[in-house]
Curated annotation (Swiss-Prot):
The modification Pyrrolidone carboxylic acid is found at Q20. One of its GO terms (molecular function) is hormone activity. Brain peptide responsible for activation of prothoracic glands to produce ecdysone in insects. GO terms for cellular component: extracellular space. The gene is BBXA8. Silk worm has two kinds of PTTH: 4K-PTTH and 22K-PTTH; there are many forms of 4K-PTTH. It comes from the Eukaryota. PROSITE patterns: INSULIN. Residues 1-19 form the signal peptide. This is Bombyxin A-8. CDD domains: IlGF_insulin_bombyxin_like.
Length: 89
């Protein structure tokens, strides 16, 4: 019985892991970056957030992770995911 349960657990784990797709990363530069951002931000219906929203709390740890870098640094100089792009909307 334990063997059957162990095999079933292993099979379900393997099946679950095989269905998990890693998020694709691409480089986005120039017009391709601008068009992609326009499409993503429009589809997400997200308004541009300003750093002032975070700074008003007075804590540096509330600043967004990418506050020191720009979108070109993160997505043109090296590949990035759609989640990273959406964080700039």
């Amino acid at each position: 019985m334990k063997l059957l349960l162990t095999i079933a657990l292993m099979l379900s784990t393997v099946m679950w892991v095989s269905t998990q797709q890693p998020q694709e990363v691409h480089t986005y530069c120039g017009r391709h970056l601008a068009r992609t951002m326009a499409d993503l931000c429009w589809e997400a219906g997200v308004d541009k957030r300003s750093d002032a929203q975070f700074a008003s709390y007075g804590s540096a740890w509330l600043m967004p992770y990418s506050a020191g870098r720009g979108i070109v640094d993160e997505c043109c100089l090296r590949p990035c995911s759609v989640d990273v792009l959406l964080s700039y909307c």
